[in-house]
């Protein structure tokens, strides 16, 4: 959630920076007007509270001195009614303000290049050269079926399209990748966590999936919830949600920062906006495994932490000897919660192109403001910065291994670094 105080004081600058994310001036003006209304109402309420306190003190003095308290009593009663009415109004305004603010994306930071879409992203560097084949390389779905690693028909039979079943060596490699990634992340200083894969709406508001992206979330049937539950429940689309929200409504001593976490979970997405895209294979699934990195930092640490997270994910691909490149996303291609994002794209010979395998984002204080995550330093509280990124998407890493390690006879070699995990 953006800082509404900053919006009031720096409206033109924020309007300009959010224009690249297609936020209209009318939308921001409506938010600014509501923020000013909230500020005015709150100030008026504080004045009434100050009057109430001052008059109550005077009322006590008059009573002790046996002076006439009739006028003071009337003033206090009338002021109390005004306060009650204004408190209700303030709550209503606050609710409207939050509704508007929750729909506004994060500001691109100064290091994010200008641009409209993925075509304007900037390549930072390539790591490892793509392999040369003396034959036409196959796509992963052909290799997966031929080697008995992937059963797409079984996924459809058990669920629907965009689900698949891994078998034999496919399942073993999937497990090996998860263990390898978690081990590597731990060595880089990230603490392993196991979290639920079902969360309440409060958690999704905290990290920015709700309210804007509810159509892409799998919602748990209300019959699952007990009658006393006040929460809608959802399957997570990423463990960024659970890892970040472990610290919602927290005040963290500054000396405990940074907090660095990693987790592996299944992730669930409806892919509502992806009709017709990547319909074959495992590139875009409703359920997939992902190993995630999340960091909670002091504001001065977040840029360096993003570099560390990118380095960690890139090193995993290098250990697997998978060619990849780092891409700096332009403002128009940034996600809703991101202020700065570096994508890692892995080379897929069967598709003859690079495909995203990780997005590592610095959200600065955007999620922290929504989830109310603060740190205490020198007796004062301030918002932390939060970062998240895949390290890595397991299914896409498996795809990359199949395509980069394929042999002329259709078999697939196993990366040396994974062999001890099998």
UniProtKB/Swiss-Prot annotation:
Keywords: Aminoacyl-tRNA synthetase, ATP-binding, Cytoplasm, Ligase, Nucleotide-binding, Protein biosynthesis. One of its GO terms (biological process) is seryl-tRNA aminoacylation. It holds the Pfam family Seryl_tRNA_N. It is an enzyme of class 6 (ligase). PROSITE patterns: AA_TRNA_LIGASE_II. ATP binds at residues 269-271, 356-359. One of its GO terms (molecular function) is ATP binding. Pathway: Aminoacyl-tRNA biosynthesis; selenocysteinyl-tRNA(Sec) biosynthesis; L-seryl-tRNA(Sec) from L-serine and tRNA(Sec): step 1/1. NCBIfam families: serS (TIGR00414). Consists of two distinct domains, a catalytic core and a N-terminal extension that is involved in tRNA binding. Belongs to the class-II aminoacyl-tRNA synthetase family. Type-1 seryl-tRNA synthetase subfamily. This is Serine--tRNA ligase. It comes from Helicobacter hepaticus (strain ATCC 51449 / 3B1).
């Amino acid at each position: 959630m953006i800082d509404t105080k900053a919006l009031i004081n720096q409206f033109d600058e924020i309007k300009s920076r959010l224009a690249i994310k297609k936020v209209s001036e009318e939308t921001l003006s409506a938010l600014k007007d509501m923020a000013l209304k909230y500020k005015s109402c709150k100030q008026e309420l504080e004045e009434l509270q100050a009057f109430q306190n001052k008059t109550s003190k005077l009322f006590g003095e008059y009573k002790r001195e046996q002076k006439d308290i009739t006028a003071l009593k009337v003033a206090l009663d009338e002021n109390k009614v005004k306060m009650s009415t204004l408190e209700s109004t303030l709550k209503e305004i606050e609710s409207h303000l939050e509704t508007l603010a929750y729909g506004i994306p994060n500001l691109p930071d100064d290091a994010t290049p200008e641009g409209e879409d993925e075509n304007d992203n900037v390549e930072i560097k390539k790591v490892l050269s793509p392999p040369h084949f003396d034959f036409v390389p196959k796509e992963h779905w052909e290799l997966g079926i031929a080697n008995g690693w992937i059963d797409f028909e079984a996924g459809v039979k058990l669920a629907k399209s965009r689900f698949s079943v891994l078998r034999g060596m496919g399942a073993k490699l999937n497990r090996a990748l998860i263990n390898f990634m978690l081990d590597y992340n731990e060595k880089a200083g990230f603490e392993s966590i196991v979290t639920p894969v079902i969360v309440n709406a409060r958690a999704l508001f905290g990290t920015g999936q709700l309210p804007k992206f509810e159509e892409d979330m799998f919602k748990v049937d209300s019959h699952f919830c007990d009658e006393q539950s006040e929460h809608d429940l959802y399957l997570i689309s990423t463990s960024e949600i659970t890892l970040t929200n472990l610290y919602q409504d927290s005040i963290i001593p500054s000396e405990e920062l940074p907090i660095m976490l990693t987790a592996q979970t299944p992730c669930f997405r409806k892919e509502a906006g992806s009709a017709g895209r990547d319909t074959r294979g495992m590139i875009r699934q409703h359920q997939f495994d992902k190993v995630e990195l999340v960091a909670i930092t002091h504001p001065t640490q977040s840029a360096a932490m993003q570099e560390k997270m990118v380095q960690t994910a890139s090193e995993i691909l290098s250990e697997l000897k998978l060619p990849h490149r780092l891409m700096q996303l332009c403002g128009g291609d940034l996600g809703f919660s991101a202020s700065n994002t570096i994508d890692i794209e892995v080379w897929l010979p069967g598709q003859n192109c690079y495909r995203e395998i990780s997005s590592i984002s610095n959200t600065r204080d955007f999620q922290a403001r929504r989830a109310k995550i603060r740190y205490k330093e020198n007796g004062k509280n301030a918002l932390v910065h939060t970062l998240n990124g895949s390290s890595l998407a397991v299914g896409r890493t498996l795809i990359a291994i199949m395509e980069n390690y394929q042999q002329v006879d259709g078999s697939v070699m196993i990366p040396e670094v994974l062999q001890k995990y099998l």
